[in-house]
């Protein structure tokens, strides 16, 4: 992918954990939906009962079984329209369906169902509030997600799901110590895949890869279903991929696909490994299958960048045009995509627009991911001194992210800080020489030029 493309994809996926795990947990807690079996969930291993008497435990879900559950709940509500818990369950299911299908038109449906639940039962309705927090996270409104999660936890302080969603929002807002506290509370209430995967990501953000690996291994060990195991194996593969370990990454993705072939991020993992190994036909096949089945913008961008790297310009432009169509669809359904599109725009010729998007986002939240995108947009519009400030901030936690080091290295080179640029570009390629279909070769070329150029 481009300079920040794979990182953008990972950001989108990680933000999606809030939607996926949160809504799965809520759906699993409603008897009207029944046992929602299948694959693609992120369920924890232990079921507890929250303060309002509903089971606070996730369930594995597929698009098909979820669609059936939605239809079942809709029929029930036509017969019993005053059933406020079922309206909350329906709202959570719509949020989950949006994530599984990459169709944001489910978000307004979720909004309506949750509003109906609260209208019927305005006091003490932690179910609807937690679902609203999950909806806000799905729309990338993390300030709203935090506010709603806190409101739900004020009613039910023993909701592990509530603490998980709160922690997710805090991570996206750049409030990392507070996020750690929320995840620890979640882990105290219900240790399992949901809490371990979140703690793993927080460790990864801080550059603590042994802890991140350990927590994901715990997530895998406690996975109560093949679907949950597939989820854990995907992120174990991501840890290996982001460290440049192709063999382990491939093994984890393949294990995950054997465990849960319907979990489509695993297909993306396999495709990028195939691309890195030069298995062009297999990579093209898997990327095409991926975007056909789950046309989320991050996957379409990644596929387009791979096509660009193969000099298939017309095919790549068709994918990039699809990104613009999807952008409009997401925005009209209330989804904030400024962060994701800022990196895409910066790398694909719309640098002024990228700076506007990144500036808007950095005023909303100060996570290291936002600061990295802002730094890159500043650089691409010629503001390198300011860009370096934010590139330093992006790496302040110690995250071992090749794209971030590449961005800072390019900025340093533009400022004539040659030795620092060489160090950062070398680090980027040492972390993962395949970190981007487009930027990794650029990093290698720039490093070679700087290394062989006269020093000032």
List each model region and its residues:
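N-terminal leader/linker segments that initiate helical-solenoid repeat arrays
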Residues: 3-127, 147, 433-434, 441, ...
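Short coil turns that delineate tetratricopeptide repeat
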Residues: 81, 122-123, 157, 190-191, ...
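Start-of-helix register in tetratricopeptide repeats
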Residues: 85, 92, 126-127, 161, ...
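Residue-level recognition of tetratricopeptide repeat
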Residues: 92, 99, 134, 168, ...
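Register position in tetratricopeptide repeats
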Residues: 96, 103, 138, 172-173, ...
């Amino acid at each position: 992918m481009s300079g920040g493309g794979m990182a953008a994809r990972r950001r989108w996926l990680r933000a999606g954990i809030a939607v996926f795990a949160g809504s799965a947990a809520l759906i699993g807690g409603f008897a009207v939906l029944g046992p929602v079996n299948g694959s693609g969930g992120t369920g924890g291993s232990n079921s507890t009962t929250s303060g309002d008497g509903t089971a606070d435990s996730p369930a594995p879900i597929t698009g098909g079984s979820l669609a059936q559950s939605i239809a079942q709940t809709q029929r029930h509500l036509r017969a019993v329209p005053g059933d406020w818990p079922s309206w909350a369950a329906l709202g959570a299911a719509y949020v989950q369906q949006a994530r599984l299908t990459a169709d944001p038109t489910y978000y307004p449906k979720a909004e309506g169902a949750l509003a109906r639940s609260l209208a019927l039962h305005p006091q003490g309705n932690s179910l609807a509030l937690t679902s609203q927090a999950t909806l806000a996270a799905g729309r990338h409104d993390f300030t709203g997600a935090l506010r709603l999660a806190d409101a739900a936890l004020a009613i039910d302080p023993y909701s592990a799901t509530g603490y998980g969603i709160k922690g997710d929002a805090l991570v996206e807002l750049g409030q990392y110590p507070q996020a750690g506290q929320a995840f620890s509370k979640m882990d105290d209430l219900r240790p399992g895949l949901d809490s371990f995967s979140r703690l793993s990501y927080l460790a990864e953000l801080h550059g603590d890869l042994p802890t991140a690996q350990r927590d994901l291994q715990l997530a895998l060990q406690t996975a109560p279903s093949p679907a949950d195991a597939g989820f854990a194996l995907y992120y174990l593969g991501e840890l290996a991929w982001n460290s440049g370990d192709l063999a382990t990454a491939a093994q984890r993705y393949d294990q995950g696909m054997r465990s849960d072939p319907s979990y489509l991020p695993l297909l993306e993992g396999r495709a990028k490994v195939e691309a890195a190994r030069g298995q062009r036909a297999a990579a093209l096949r898997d990327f095409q299958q991926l975007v056909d089945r789950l046309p989320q913008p991050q996957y379409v961008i990644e596929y387009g960048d791979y096509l660009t790297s193969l000099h298939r310009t017309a095919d790549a432009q068709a994918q990039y045009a699809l990104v613009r169509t999807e952008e409009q669809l997401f925005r009209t359904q209330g989804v904030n995509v400024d962060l994701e599109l800022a990196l895409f725009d910066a790398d694909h010729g719309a640098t002024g627009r990228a700076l506007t998007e990144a500036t808007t986002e950095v005023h909303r939240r100060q996570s290291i991911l936002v600061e990295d995108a802002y730094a890159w947009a500043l650089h691409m519009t010629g503001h390198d001194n300011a860009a370096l400030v934010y590139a330093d901030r992006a790496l302040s936690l110690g995250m071992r992210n090749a794209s971030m080091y590449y961005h800072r290295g390019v900025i340093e080179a533009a400022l004539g800080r040659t030795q620092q640029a060489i160090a950062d570009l070398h680090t980027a390629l040492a972390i993962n020489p395949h970190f981007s279909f487009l930027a990794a070769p650029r990093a290698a070329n720039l490093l070679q030029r700087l290394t062989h150029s006269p020093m000032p």
